[in-house]
Design a protein with these regions (language model features):
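N-terminal helix-loop segment corresponding to the beta1-alpha1 unit
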Residues: 1-182, 186-192, 377-400
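Flexible, small-/acidic-enriched active-site or ligand-binding loops
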Residues: 2-3, 7, 345-393
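Glycine-rich beta-alpha junction loops
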Residues: 46, 130-131, 203-208, 215, ...
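Short Gly/Pro-enriched turn/cap motifs at secondary-structure boundaries
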Residues: 63, 228-233, 238-239, 345-348, ...
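Conserved Rossmann-fold dehydrogenase catalytic segment
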Residues: 132, 160-170, 191-207, 226-233, ...
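Oxidoreductase and adenylate-handling cofactor-binding alpha/beta cores
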Residues: 176-196, 209-221, 262-269
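Aromatic-enriched alpha-helical interface/lid elements that frame and gate functional surfaces
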Residues: 236-312, 316
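A glycine-rich dinucleotide-binding beta-alpha-beta segment and adjacent secondary-structure elements
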Residues: 311-365
Length: 400
């Protein structure tokens, strides 16, 4: 897909200036760009976003996903001239997105108050570890720390081991997602009132927001959830079970679904057993029930168990690896993974734009730009009227 492809999606009339780096802020920008917004990402000259060199394998590809559909320019935000350039970009934008430590933009003369004086309807999206206020606001914060503080890390892993982590930067993407939600709500508010505002999304609070009923469980019942491995305490059966040739996940914790599972297992009597007949009883006898199911699954192949679960309408599935996703007909039918042409790869595969929209579907028009400052001439020339000579001068002095 060429960079001149026409943007599609519900946000094609929105311009966002992205000042963030790495994951949390840029994930919000990625979602906006996927939905058609004109996202102009500002990177420091000479080095760029550190994510450009992050990744595994022979080539760092994280950048290609995170900065897809974005136009990338350089500006030295530590220099007054660089700040002035960015201020001019923001003056003509709908939104500005940043994920620096709280107070950084203020030190650069880019506070919301200063920017909104020139652009009263401006929406500022601020993503940070701890938020813009409070005693921890000035601390450096990464996803790992936010996941720990927000309570998620304590619940991850086996009960007899130290807390573990998910294999992804969940805190970052959660914060970016909530930031995007806040920004879209702020756009709606601006349409009705003309007012801009600040979105303050922290990593730890984004994690806290998905912690279900852990807070009231403790304050009302003095109950603290603990690590439980592949199961959830008192929710049964919902676990990963051994098969002859692999492992398989079964989630049959609702009463009617559990009855269907018992029929599939050829043991309908279990559904009327007092130990398992009701949700609460199954939770109290979770270990016994998991052992019974595991004894049954280990005598069958993964495909055999899957066929029985499908036949009886029991929610279940294989534990997919990346190759499994690429080979799966459902992924293919819904185009969940697509080929994106690039200069280096004719068919670079990556996850598509989600969610799907029946009227205003977004698309991947290009991947993260290869060259640092690739859109300097286009953006600074078209939007600010700078000439090639102006840009050459700014480049020679490390302003861009």
């Amino acid at each position: 897909m060429k960079e001149e492809s026409t943007a599609t999606g519900p946000l094609t009339d929105v311009r966002l200036i992205e000042l963030g780096q790495l994951i949390a802020g840029p994930f919000c920008g990625q979602m906006m760009a996927d939905m058609g917004a004109d996202v102009i990402k500002v990177e420091p000259p000479g080095t760029g976003d550190p994510l450009r060199v992050w990744g595994r394998g022979d080539y760092p590809l994280w950048w290609k996903v995170s900065s897809r559909n974005k136009r990338c320019v350089t500006a030295n935000l530590r220099e007054p001239e660089g700040q002035a350039l960015v201020r001019r970009l923001i003056a003509g934008a709908d939104m500005v997105l940043e994920n620096f430590r709280a107070g950084t933009l203020e030190r650069w003369g880019l506070s919301y108050e200063e920017l909104a004086a020139e652009n009263p309807g401006l929406i500022m999206i601020r993503v940070s570890g701890y938020g813009q206020t409070g005693p921890y606001s000035s601390r450096a914060g990464y996803a790992a720390v936010g996941e720990a503080m927000g309570g998620m890390r304590y619940l991850c892993g086996e009960p007899d081991r130290q807390p573990s982590r998910a294999g992804l930067s969940v805190g970052d993407t959660l914060a970016g997602t909530f930031a995007c939600m806040g920004a879209l709500a702020a756009l709606h508010h601006r349409e009705r009132t003309g007012e801009g505002q600040v979105i303050d999304a922290s990593i730890y609070e984004s994690v806290l927001n998905i912690m279900e009923a852990t807070i009231p469980e403790y304050t009302v019942s003095n109950y603290i959830r603990e690590r439980s491995g592949s199961s959830l305490p008192n929710v049964a059966p919902s676990n990963i079970y051994d098969c002859k040739d692999g492992i398989f996940l079964i989630a049959a914790n609702q009463d009617t679904v559990f009855r269907r599972l018992c029929t599939a297992m050829g043991k309908p009597e279990l559904a009327d057993d007092d130990r398992f007949a009701k949700h609460t009883a199954r939770g109290e006898n979770q270990a016994i029930l998991d052992a019974l199911i595991n004894d049954w699954t280990r005598e069958k192949s993964v495909n055999e168990v899957e066929a029985l679960m499908l036949e009886h309408g029991v929610p279940a599935g294989k534990i997919f690896t990346t190759p499994d996703m690429l080979d799966d007909p459902h992924f293919q039918a819904r185009e969940a993974i697509v080929d994106v042409p690039t200069d280096k790869w004719p068919d670079l595969k990556m996850q598509n734009v989600f969610p799907k929209m029946s009227k205003t579907q977004g698309q991947i028009r290009w991947t993260g730009p290869e060259e640092l400052g690739e859109h300097n001439e286009e953006v600074y020339g078209d939007l600010l009227g700078l000439t090639p000579e102006d840009l050459a001068d700014l480049h020679s002095r490390n302003i861009i």
